[in-house]
Amino acid sequence: MVSERTEEEQIEAFKNWWAENGLKTILGIFLIFGGYVGWQSYESKVASESQAASDIWQTIITTMNEAPDGNLSQENIVSIHKNGDKLKNEYGSTSYAHFAAAMKAKLAVEANNIELAVQELNWVLDNGADNAFVPIITLRLAKLEASRKNYEEALKILENADPGTLKSSFEETKGDLYMVLERTDEAYTAYNSAILFNKSSDQLLN
């Protein structure tokens, strides 16, 4: 029930936070525990790795943008998966790797390879994705599990995660799962919570 704009704002907020604070936070921690010489060496290394990861991510974006009408060729898809795997394997702690894995999951869903999509989203959650990005990935993972009729697993995923600003979407999805499982009372409770959280979000936006 929460608007699509909410997810877009979550992603944009994460991108902005990383651009403004992510690298400074990492380098700041090192400065506390390291000396000036170590700082210079580490600063150079991190900057180099960040730029390399950024370049690979830009290649992925360029490949997608150049596809006519958004229709990716098989060559495009192979290229995106290849560069995504490179980011995951060589720069797995960066936001670029997390976004690449999410992109790979999207392509896997479009290819009806739900197992691969689930693996990619789990990789994001297991490899230090920022808290701002986690609720989006968690919700998508739960819906994928539901799509292959793993309803109890989908519920478990949602119940064990912090929904962040996606509380309404989490509760609505829980309601859908409870209905499939014929747990009607719990479904109505979840739907009511979704409505309340959605109204609360609307008030914050106004």
What are the language-model segments listed below?
Residues 1-31:
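N-terminal positive-inside, membrane-proximal cytosolic segments immediately preceding the first
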Residues 51-52, 56, 76-79, 92, ...:
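Structural signature of alpha-solenoid helical repeat junctions
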Residues 58-90:
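Short extracytoplasmic
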Residues 77, 97-169:
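Alpha-helical adaptor scaffolds
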Residues 84, 91, 127-128, 164-165, ...:
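Alpha-helical junction/boundary sensor with strong preference for TPR arrays
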Residues 152-206:
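Extracytoplasmic/periplasmic C-terminal soluble domains
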